[in-house]
Amino acid sequence: MRYSVVIPVYNRPGEIDELLKTLTEVTYKSFEVLVIEDGSTNTCAHIIDRYADSLDIRYFQKENTGQGFSRNFGFKRAKGDYYVVFDSDCLIPAHYFDAVNDVIDQHNGIDCWGGPDRAHESFTPVQKAINYSMTSLFTTGGTRGNRHHIGSYHPRSFNMGISKEVFAETRGYIITRMGEDIEFSIRIQKSRFNAHLINDAFVYHKRRTSFKQFYKQLFFFGRARVNIWRFHPKELKVVHLFPLLFAVFLIYSAVGLLFNFPLSKELMMLYLVFGVVLMADAYRIEKSILVALYAAAAGFIQLTSYGLGFLREIFRANKEQGDSIINTD
């Protein structure tokens, strides 16, 4: 068996149903599925039963330990040569494993891979806008997986695969949440394994369904970036300050308009131009005025919430250690 698909889930039976349905429709069939119920009160046991005949599926219930350690739980019980992890809110296109197989066969085996995410046609306008914001060069600076990726590529565990040798060497996740996937990806590469970005191995990632949920998630992501520094100090770069600067100057310019602060009008004009750029680019991709408007809002929410989360955690880190934590190399 080539692949073991490991899916941790916490109180989301509806998402698991949709994900498993897409896995029944993939063209490559040499894989098993391990669903890890991570201490849920609203379990998906009844959903798993529906797929017993159409998928090689195993279901485990355990105490809540978080998604990172739940993936380790699955890896230890996996039978495949490669371990694939998806988030429960993903939909898998039919060609996914074919795209990965092509790269594995071309390189006579690979250590680790990840792929991008896209918006499915069934997504709501808000979901499409959030997907745009989370994948756009203008809002991520090319730090996430796409064709315009800048710098070292670190697969994210909404769409990631590793060989069983990688797991044997690294022992998997050492933190269970708050940047656990990036920390794992960094450690994989430090162990001299290679990570491949496979653009055709994309998934449809629902992410959050409201801007309030999106704000909370990105605030957490900002905190997670500082948490990663605790394990890998050199991985915190100047580029990670950009959302913080975005948030600080946005607040300054907004308050400054009320109290006539210096340069507040000029700064606000720059933010307006940035918003127009986001709308134009989102409209080019989605061909929807509503999605374009939402995309501009999502971009501002993403950068501001990430920056504020980063700021909160950096204060905590400075209390723990008096050193400077920004690597300028």
Task: Enumerate the language-model features and the residues they cover.
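Short, acidic, metal-binding catalytic loop of nucleotide-sugar glycosyltransferases
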Residues: 21-30
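A conserved acidic beta->alpha catalytic loop
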Residues: 22, 37-46, 65, 87-93
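Acidic donor-binding/catalytic loop of UDP-sugar-dependent glycosyltransferases
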Residues: 43, 90-103, 186
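Glycine-rich, basic loop-to-helix element that forms the pyrophosphate-binding segment
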Residues: 62-78, 99, 150, 154-158
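Short aromatic/hydrophobic "clamp" motif used to bind/position activated sugar donors
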Residues: 83
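Conserved donor NDP-sugar-binding/catalytic core segment of glycosyltransferases
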Residues: 95-128, 201-202, 206
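A recurrent flexible, glycine/aromatic-enriched loop bordering the glycosyltransferase active site
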Residues: 119, 140-165, 176-177, 183, ...
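Catalytic donor/gating beta->alpha subdomain of glycosyltransferases that bind UDP-sugars
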Residues: 174-236
